[in-house]
Amino acid sequence: MLPWVRTSWWVSKLLRESVSREGRLLKMKTNWTKIFAVMLASATLSFAVLAQAPDNGTQKPAAATPSADQILDKYVAAIGGEAAWHKLNSRIAKGTIEIPAMSLSGTVESHEKAPNSMLVVVNLGGAAFQRGCDGTTAWSDDPQNGLRTETGAEADDSKRQSDFYHQVNMRKYYSKWNLTGTEKIGDHDAYAVEATSTAGDMDKLYFDTQTGLLVRAITTVHTPQGAMVIQSDLSDYRDTDGIKLPFTVHQSSAQSDYTLKFTEVKHNVQFADSQFAKPATEPAAQPAAH
């Protein structure tokens, strides 16, 4: 899952709980991350725009339908290629989150460090949410559940999404790729690829037939409340330090929808490993002195 889909995947998990805003308790069972990745990027699942050949007015022969493996290869090339990605070892991204149905807006910030550390912080409606993984332990901290360690399928999800090079390591996380046809996604003709994860989930990825960009991803996320299917739509791709990233991710599920817009991205930032570790719990209350 690509960066923003990974991030939005984590955001959606954070926002499934309730937050207090202006004296009201809002139940927020929203989607994602991950995004690809976004966020997951996850998304997250973001793909670079390939340069378009100029139209010289001549009729071009119809291109042969590529295989699923060729589509994946085009994706890796489109986002800059493995060499460009491995020149980067960390990332900080800042942006905004909007939930129109609840008239809520806030900020989101993600920190990522190779090989597999990630931290997402969301401030929304006066409440703060955090989700982190140090490569070994995945954890979250939110107003409803407090600080907790993730377990089972939820923890496995978080650890997979924390791979900094997930987008060029996708063959590591998907055991099977199957091209099912071509579909229209907005203004894009897209190849629809069913991808079976090593965890057994079936994701559906839509790649622009011309650019190789991922324009939509339908993925399964595991939470303490059960599995959740999320649709991520990616747009506004920009060049960033030799790679391309989508700066807008819109996510929707059966519960709600929201939009992440990233405004600032920096690579090769220095992070201490301790920043991604689960915070120490508050000390137990001491008995009163007699």
List PLM regions with ranges.
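Bacterial N-terminal signal peptides that target proteins for export
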Residues: 19, 27-39
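Bacterial N-terminal signal peptides
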Residues: 37-48
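N-terminal mature ectodomain segment of secretory-pathway/periplasmic proteins
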Residues: 63, 70-146, 173-181
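Acidic/charged, solvent-exposed loop-and-adjacent secondary-structure segments enriched in E/D, K/R, S/T
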Residues: 139-166
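Gly/Pro-enriched, hydrophobic low-complexity segments
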Residues: 127, 189-280
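Tryptophan (W) side chains
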Residues: 4, 9-10, 32
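Short, Lys/Arg-enriched N-terminal segments with co-localized hydrophobic residues
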Residues: 9-27
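Compositionally biased, proline/threonine/alanine/serine-rich low-complexity intrinsically disordered stretches
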Residues: 45, 51-66, 75, 281-290
